[in-house]
Amino acid sequence: MKLHIFNPENDMALASGSPGYTPPANIRAYRRRHWELPRQWAAPEDIVWDGESSLAHLFANDADALEICPWGWSPALVHELELAGVPRHRMPDREWLGKLRRLSGRGSTVAVQRVLGIDATCCESLDDVLSCLSQWGAIIMKSPWSSSGKGLMLTDNPNWQGWVRRILRQQGSVVVERLLRRRQDFAMEFWMKDGRAEYMGLNLFSTDAHGHFIENIKGSEQEKETMLLSQLDNPESLDGIRQWFVERLPLLAPWYSGPVGVDMLITPDGHLHPCVEINWRMTMGMVAVLGQ
């Protein structure tokens, strides 16, 4: 039996690192409205927490039989669950949470991108960013920490240099990647457990010109794969990168258990960009896959 928790503020809570982190009012309201979302993939016997009820009675007897499955882990969620009556030893310790925080930053994705031959780097000054712009011609800039789909900037925004200075001041660096035109956005969803990664399925979605999520594209796994293969100049690359992540994700984090979503895209000329983002938590893509 599992205890499911929908905490959509997880990215920023993890970035904060503070047990006392408080999400913005609109995010708190969103969580209250949608706390039942995990029912879409939960088993009938599972429990979905409303974010308010005491949980102490669930751990009074046979506590180890109940698996805690949040949208994502952070020190703030651990603190919240402690206040609700969950024993501290049933949750990740400080060392595990620290490793997850480092892994979840966009700087860790850059390390994977470089192995895959993708033009991406972490810049620690505006001059570094300008150098990337000169070298690559068109770039997308990302804050190392932000909520999902946020923290992105393009040079067509007249205030982009001020944005870079602010992110450098607040977070110490800015992630810069060569900007690619996109024909199709999609993600591969994986589940990690016991040092192994299992491929779960594909999620296709649409985005705006700045890469912000708009909506998922519905279809069976076979229909989605057929759609992608028809757009690729090298169809074999899809299976190749799927196997690459099955093998490499456990090497990146052998201690991690839970969902992993890898965002990818196909360019107008059919080239596969195999790693746009890596999300070490639940995603709406995984929700779509589990709901099939």
What is each PLM-predicted segment?
Residues 120, 139-163, 184-187, 209-229:
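Glycine-rich phosphate-binding loop of ATP-grasp-fold ATP-dependent ligases
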Residues 157-214, 261, 265-275:
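Phosphate-binding site of ATP-dependent enzymes
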Residues 203, 210-254:
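A conserved active-site cap/scaffold subdomain adjacent to cofactor or substrate pockets
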Residues 29, 200-223, 281-283, 290-292:
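Extended active-site and interfacial segments that coordinate phosphate-rich ligands
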Residues 2-39:
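N-terminal-proximal low-complexity accessory segments that begin disordered
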Residues 197, 235-292:
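ATP-dependent carboxylate activation and anion-phosphoryl transfer catalytic cores
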Residues 27-43, 48-134:
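Conserved N-proximal alpha/beta basic substrate-recognition cap immediately N-terminal to
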